[in-house]
From Swiss-Prot:
Belongs to the Iojap/RsfS family. The keyword Mitochondrion applies. One of its GO terms (cellular component) is mitochondrion. It is found in: Mitochondrion matrix. This is Mitochondrial assembly of ribosomal large subunit protein 1. It comes from Mus musculus. The gene is Malsu1. InterPro entries: Iojap/RsfS/C7orf30, NT_sf. It holds the Pfam family RsfS. Residues 53-77 are annotated as: Disordered.
Length: 228
């Protein structure tokens, strides 16, 4: 290294090329040395990290500078999904991120053969419910594997209740008053208990039960009992 060498002088050509590349846009994409340069100098990081830019893109679509580079390069490939999975932890995290209230997760017994997890959440308004569903579905499509089932949405035209079936998870998003009316939590967690309770007859006192009497008077006639 000569006496005039400095890190700034070494990095200046790279910064200049990067600025030219950003200004030129798609025209520079065909230059063969650019991918090698990016591969050499850009730090490696997990492609599945939910960075603010990725979250912003999922909410509002690609930014103007991203759209100019072509939609084909924005499509995620199989390598982009390594390490990320749309499971119950991811679902609950996204619901909390979208300010869902009173999240309830119920693990469904396997013998029911319906789903693995039954999730219930509340929204503050109809718009909030639809926004949460839209975001969940968008994230699922972004992270899903080819073998994962398609999403099924029920209640698209409803104002107070939407249901999304992800296959291994089913989520119900409702307004608080609707949730209080149907009480799905009790239906899925206390159903056997409620069925047994419904079979019990109304409470009645047995014929041989007399409140507050300790002595055995079963052998006495009504007249003798009254005199005693």
């Amino acid at each position: 290294m000569g006496p005039g060498w400095s890190p700034a002088r070494r990095l200046w050509p790279l910064l200049w090329r990067r600025a030219v590349f950003q200004r030129a846009g798609p025209a520079m994409a065909s230059v063969p040395w650019l991918p090698r340069l990016a591969e050499r100098w850009l730090p490696a990081r997990p492609a599945t990290c939910l960075t603010p830019s990725l979250t912003r893109g999922l909410h509002h679509g690609p930014q103007p500078e991203e759209r100019t580079a072509g939609d084909a390069r924005l499509q995620p490939g199989p390598a982009d999904h390594i390490g990320a999975k749309f499971d119950i932890d991811m679902l609950v995290s996204l619901l909390r991120q979208e300010n869902a209230r009173d999240i309830c997760v119920i693990q469904v017994p396997p013998e029911m053969r319906y789903t693995d997890y039954f999730v219930i959440g509340s929204g503050t308004s109809t718009r909030h419910l639809h926004a949460m569903v839209h975001y969940l579905v968008k994230m699922y499509k972004h992270l899903k594997c080819r073998s994962d089932p398609y999403v099924k949405i029920e209640g698209k035209d409803a104002d107070d209740w939407l249901c999304v079936d992800f296959g291994s998870m089913v989520i119900h998003l409702m307004l608080p008053e609707t949730r209080e009316t149907y009480e799905l939590e009790k239906l899925w967690t206390l159903r056997s208990f409620d069925d047994q309770l419904a079979q019990i007859a109304a409470e009645t006192l047995p014929e041989d039960f007399i409140l507050g009497l300790e002595d055995d008077t079963s052998s006495l006639t009504p007249v003798e009992f009254k005199c005693k």
